[in-house]
Amino acid sequence: MTEMQLLEMLKKEASSVHIKDIMSASVYLREDARYLPPREQKEFIERFTRAFFNRIRDIKNDKNIYQGHVDTAGLKEFIDFLDQQLSQAKTENERCFQKIARIITIYVTFVRKEPVHPVGTRFPGGFTVRREGNVFYCPVKDRQINTPGALCRFCVSIQDHDIS
């Protein structure tokens, strides 16, 4: 499968995402973030809601020409992982979140070759995902790589070794 074929499939999926779905995903984020400090909670919800809206729009409008082929074994493993997460969703809001996250993470990982969390994403302690040239650095990858439910093992970023 080519990256362009995958992009076309993702565009079709993205066209089925409506503002109501993004709002439902936002409600799930609010529920999921309830244990964060209030300031971080607000930033977390706003950042992810904005990212969902922007990324779905980006997918729908992506006119780039991608020349590569998709790692189909990696994609299958990734989809199996996402299917497992979706099957464990407890609410309709969580299912909306999983549906949107699935489209976006497949797009950024297998078409764009970018990290799951966009450059600039802030983690506790103020550390951020950053880019130098074509390399993406994550401040928490090594600590989160084995966390159940985390997408870190599929992410193209590497651990930021400037962070201890």
Curated annotation (Swiss-Prot):
A Pfam family it matches: DUF2115
| Family matches, as InterPro entries | DUF2115
Which HAMAP family does the record cross-reference, listed alphabetically? UPF0305 (MF_00763)
Family per record: Belongs to the UPF0305 family.
Annotated protein name in UniProt = UPF0305 protein MTH_812
